[in-house]
Structures are given as C-alpha cells and as structure tokens.
C-alpha cells in the first residue's frame, strides 16, 4: 500500500497539499456559526447523491411522474429513505443558507476585499431557492402542478416582456409536459452545474482571502 502512495506522492505531492490545507490559519474569534456555510455545502452533496439515485427510477412525464415517485416510495429498496433524506436535506440546506447569509452580513463579511465572495454567495442563495422551486414540481401532483402554475405566472405582470418570460418558463402558453421537462432539466443538470461552479469560485476566494475578522 505504501508503494502505491509513494507513486502518487512522487507525482502529485499529496503531502504538501495536505500540509497546506491543515496549516491554514484560523482566527481565534471563529465559532460554531462560521460552520453554517460548510453545513450548507454538506447538504448540497447529500442532495446530489440522493437526487442521482432517484434519477434511475423517476420518469419526467406528466402521465408517469407521480407514479414513478410512488414507485420509489413503495417499491424500491430504501427508496422511501432516499427520497425522505433528499427532502429533509433540501429543507436543511435552505435553512442553513439563510442563517449563513445572516451571519456573514451581521459580521461584515461582505466588506472590502470580500465583495466578490459576497456576490457569489448571493448567487448561490438564489440558486438554492431555485432548486426548491423546480424540485417541488417534479412529483407532478396537485400541489406541484399548482405551485408551478403560480410561480411561472408571476412574471406575467412585467410590462412588455412578461408574456415572453412566462412562455419561456412554461415552454408553451399553458403548464404541461414542456414545463415539467424544463423544470426537470433545470433541477438535475443546469442548477447543479451552476451551483458547483459558483461554489468552487466561492471556496477559492475564501481560501485566498481568509475568514473576515471580528467587527
């Protein structure tokens, strides 16, 4: 085993990377509330894992979506547990994200030179809420259907471009298969990709600039 490690160590300098990570200075004022961002990230990882597992059985069609969710809950081994963890983790992710944003704001973590870190954080907050909106519709039950109809109908009040935005979100004039397909694509591909990208940038900036000092 040591020979395998030595082979990778010689080429990648793993120990140097580990030493750099473990030796990063942590200010003395840091407390448990500074862990909220890390908890949010952990929830995201859980979401990716459980969501990926459910894609093997979920069918994004208006006729089969609800039945496939029912199948996951009642027939798939531990399917009820996987979906329940996905739902609980989603709620926890939103809660931790809100608390994290409040903590950063109240401790002045958005001030110079961390403005871009704050901006990427707000974008991540918007993406997190978008996960909730798109995921809520995927079972395509009565609650999900009417939630989508209301949410996608909100932009209609915008002058000139309102109707265009509504049709862009729904895929047609009314809510239907095109809407479910778009929300499924957003929830399982577009939003995770954007979130992972902005998280990487967010973490790199935190790593570069360090944790903000006390007020």
From Swiss-Prot:
GO biological process: photosynthetic electron transport chain; respiratory electron transport chain
Alphabetical UniProt keywords: Chloroplast, Electron transport, Heme, Iron, Membrane, Metal-binding, Photosynthesis, Plastid, Thylakoid, Transmembrane, Transmembrane helix, Transport
Cofactor: heme b; heme c
Cofactor note: Binds 2 heme b groups non-covalently with two histidine residues as axial ligands.
Purpose of the protein: Component of the cytochrome b6-f complex, which mediates electron transfer between photosystem II (PSII) and photosystem I (PSI), cyclic electron flow around PSI, and state transitions.
Cellular component, GO, one term: chloroplast thylakoid membrane
Remaining remarks: Heme 1 (or BH or b566) is high-potential and absorbs at about 566 nm, and heme 2 (or BL or b562) is low-potential and absorbs at about 562 nm.
Subunit record text: The 4 large subunits of the cytochrome b6-f complex are cytochrome b6, subunit IV (17 kDa polypeptide, PetD), cytochrome f and the Rieske protein, while the 4 small subunits are PetG, PetL, PetM and PetN. The complex functions as a dimer.
Binding site for heme b 2: 86, 187
Gene3D superfamilies in the cross-refs: Cytochrome Bc1 Complex, Chain C
Taxonomy, superkingdom: Eukaryota
PROSITE patterns, per the entry: CYTB_NTER
InterPro entries, A to Z: Cyt_b/b6_N, Cyt_B6_PetB, Cytb/b6-like_sf, Cytochrome_b_N_euk/bac, Di-haem_cyt_TM
Family to which the UniProt record says this protein belongs: Belongs to the cytochrome b family. PetB subfamily.
One MF term in the entry's GO annotations: oxidoreductase activity
Location(s) in or outside the cell: Plastid, Chloroplast thylakoid membrane
NCBIfam families: PRK03735.1
Residues where heme b 1 binds: 100, 202
Membrane topology listed for this record: Multi-pass membrane protein
Residues that coordinate or bind heme c: 35
Membrane-crossing segments per the record: 32-52, 90-110, 116-136, 186-206
Protein name: Cytochrome b6
PANTHER family assigned: CYTOCHROME B (PTHR19271:SF16)
Predominant location: plastid
